[in-house]
């Protein structure tokens, strides 16, 4: 009787650990997907700010390099 109760408790603990581990993997996959989408949106916003290759961005310290606004670049030099 005691052995069967112990086995049931160990089985429940093993299932709980396995389910928790699989949830972590699913959450990591979702987080990676969301980060990718948000990064892509930020990239699109940066491209929208650029007027073209090596054009000035809104901030005079920024300029477009490959259609992305980047800091610490001097446009045309």
From Swiss-Prot:
Disulfide bonds join 50-64, 57-69, 63-75. Residues 22-49 form a propeptide. One of its GO terms (cellular component) is extracellular region. It comes from the Eukaryota. It is found in: Secreted. Residues 1-21 form the signal peptide. Expressed by the venom gland. Its main location: secreted. Keywords: Amidation, Disulfide bond, Ion channel impairing toxin, Knottin, Secreted, Signal, Toxin. The modification Lysine amide is found at residue 77. One of its GO terms (molecular function) is toxin activity. Belongs to the neurotoxin 10 (Hwtx-1) family. 65 (Jztx-21) subfamily. The presence of a 'disulfide through disulfide knot' structurally defines this protein as a knottin. Probable ion channel inhibitor. This is U14-theraphotoxin-Cg1a 3. It comes from Chilobrachys guangxiensis.
